[in-house]
């Protein structure tokens, strides 16, 4: 069970869209998208090498267009997908990048340092390796093919390999992927655009200014972004700048924010009014209030993301992965420094760059890895990062003009993706073999950290009781008073530790309650807030949290500030505990560990006392 995020009227800040979502539903969606991408890749390869290969080529070169008066505009199917539809892909990437740097994982510099530096090395080292094979000439211009990792395939590969305790390495790789995307976008904008036409460029700048002002419109901001986005695409196309960057530009200018208390409560009031007196006026007001309580960035990701994952990217694979793999093509590719440069850049360059940078950051003390994340696991993830598909094939099409050399580069990308998967699989399997996994969940994964954990009792107490629970769980020991009896029995001989494990499927308000407790903890009021939350388990709505914070002795303005502005710090404190619980395959609350060993059996005070007494002996 992993923490998920809900867009609800409870109003606490949302989790990052790509980094911190760990729900089974989200993972299933990611895996399905990766499977669909792989399916269409295979279809394209089979089609291009079948007796019907001519129909594949004919489809790609089919012209689609429109005209009015003396003006006509048309594109081939391939360019329609690569230059028009892929704009939506880069739009989603831009939204995610904006979010992560504004309110997401990359706002926490200490956590982001290692994956950010590793990502930068994972961009630079592959390019250097590629240029070692292709130091000059037209081939050298294709260095951008090897700099990017395909996030969809990366997530899917990790799901197929199933390494031991994947949560930490998955989060690390997704953080890395955001920076990887930024580097790829910069490379496309700077190095892979045609000669610039000044007139259309001036128009594009004017459209960008208009886009920056859209956020101040009182209504119809969505349609305004759409219309101006199309205008920007046309202006960039005419200016000689790759038009897909219009998607990035629009995304970067769309505001993103964490939901604030007043808009959320206003939405709740509107819904309550509609419930009491259903009519069209109240319905419109409630709908508008709900929309405005969530940033346009969030709404756009929700609206456009599925279409990108399940329609646009599979179409992109279909029109770009159809490489002729006959004997002559393969022999030409085997002798081509372009092919070998792509393979070496992605497979070796990514691995050396990411692993080496991570080792260097740890060695110099400039960064730290999350608990349970080892360099061996980073190495496995670094190997999988050599799966460079979507943006790699995209850059092949714009960096190389000769069709024969394009096929050589595409063969390199496909071969590198297969080799990177096998390489990553081998590293994870060897790692698990060298460090044989113990029975999952039998022992406490992360030792007690008095400076970090929420504890009661002496740090050097001979007995330790760790509880993973949530504030909505009616059976959690703290709620039933069992822990108080146990502490009273052992006195200073017992150290009690609370860790978060919000079971949202059963307890939908538990995650918000956990975050509220961490906001109170920043004022030294964790246990007071926990007491209030347990005492009011049936009333854990958003508005209730502030009332409980006051009762716990919190400064309410500081509490509100900590929840909203410092949301990443509060968030990580909860998700760290939840990821530990997932890694131990915990599935119920409360789950207790007696002196580091999982307690099995009743959790009433008498049973816990007997278990602890046995541990003393």
UniProtKB/Swiss-Prot annotation:
Its main location: membrane. The keyword Cell membrane applies. Pfam families: Na_H_antiport_1 (PF06965), Thioredoxin_4 (PF13462). The chain crosses the membrane at residues 33-53, 75-95, 113-133, 141-161, 171-191, 194-214, 234-254, 304-324, 340-360, 378-398, 411-431. GO terms for cellular component: plasma membrane. It comes from the Bacteria. Residues 1-433 are annotated as: Na(+)/H(+) antiporter NhaA. It catalyses: Na(+)(in) + 2 H(+)(out) = Na(+)(out) + 2 H(+)(in). Residues 434-617 form the Thioredoxin domain. One of its GO terms (biological process) is regulation of pH. One of its GO terms (molecular function) is sodium:proton antiporter activity. Keywords: Antiport, Cell membrane, Ion transport, Membrane, Sodium, Sodium transport, Transmembrane, Transmembrane helix, Transport. It is found in: Cell membrane. Coiled coil: none annotated. Na(+)/H(+) antiporter that extrudes sodium in exchange for external protons. In the N-terminal section; belongs to the NhaA Na(+)/H(+) (TC 2.A.33) antiporter family. This is Na(+)/H(+) antiporter NhaA 1.
